[in-house]
Amino acid sequence: MKKTFLLALISFLWCFHQSCQAQTGTQLVAANQNGFYYHGRINFANPKAPEFYWPGTSVDFIFRGSKLLKILLEDEKGKNYFNVILNNQYAKPYLLKCQKGKKKYAVYNNLDAGKSYSVSIFKRTETDEGYTKFMGIELDNGADLAMVKRAYSPRIEFFGNSITVGMGNEDPTGRDNMNPAKKNNYLSYAAITARDLGLDYRCTAKSGIGVMVSWYDLIMPEMYDRVHPDKPALKHDFKSWIPDIVVVNLFQNDSWLVNMTRDPNHKKRFKQGKPTAQQIVKAYMNFISNLRKVYPKAKIVCTLGSMNAVSPGKPWKGYIQQAVNLMKKYYKDQQLYTLFFAYNNRKIGHPTVTDHIKMADQLKKFLKQNILK
């Protein structure tokens, strides 16, 4: 009898110990589970490890019942940076610097398990820094993701270059622009505009790119329809996410390279010599026409700035305005707009966060007055 009782007691204590361990342990919440909400052009070939490429790509979720949050990522080069925003505290993000390969990042450790927390994991950097695979999160056992029915938000997509990416915007000196740590799409004019206006945001931008010529062998008309900029066979499904508003900010790189006759990219793109004004306008019209084909109902805002392509005496604003005027006249496209950002008069480097805030203010005002009214 005593022996039986003793065995039963030992068995009970062992089960209790295992139960406590289970309750105090952790669990993996895989990236393909319900409760994760993704934003951006993402490669879901492996649903348990979706690949993030573009700046501004993000995943949002709400969890409850956990004191900790760990994020599982696999980074290609160890050069990407993410903002982790807890409970919409936009001004105080957790800065996550990726290490190369598969890593687990302990982001929060002392949360109140009795509360719910909203989280956004936002890619600050771009495809130049390589891909990042999101492999899920780790929470305390017993925690779960909240299923949230989200109201529809108007959608906005930006097509642009390093200005839209946010290259060097956290480098006030202008001399360390190439440092990925100084690149923050979260504080680009594009992301600020979308966030402040409550728009669902997507950013299809790459530093150095142009409409006719780039600083490398790829131009926007060749890249705009790809899931990954360097993989032409991997095409984006434009029907999977349709924006209400499209903002195009291109021609800054063209404005330099059309005059650099010795540059190899210039030589390849302009075999017959420097392009004429008519050819430049036609190239812009062709690209906007490509966007119109895939987004027939979108309001398209053609912008430029705030670097020296919009400085006094430069013809590039005129090229864009002429292209839009011609498309309105001959294609009867009345859903085209133009907006030119004020020249920031910066002699070195890219627009800073201060410049981006001014650009965002200008764009927000324009959208409110002309499209979101």
Regions found by a protein language model. Name each.
Residues T164, G198, R202, F251, ...:
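Sec-exported extracytoplasmic/periplasmic mature domains
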Residues A151, W241, R292-Y295:
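Short, conserved loop/helix-junction motifs that constitute active-site signature segments
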Residues A298-S306, P312-K373:
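Extracellular serine-dependent O-acyl
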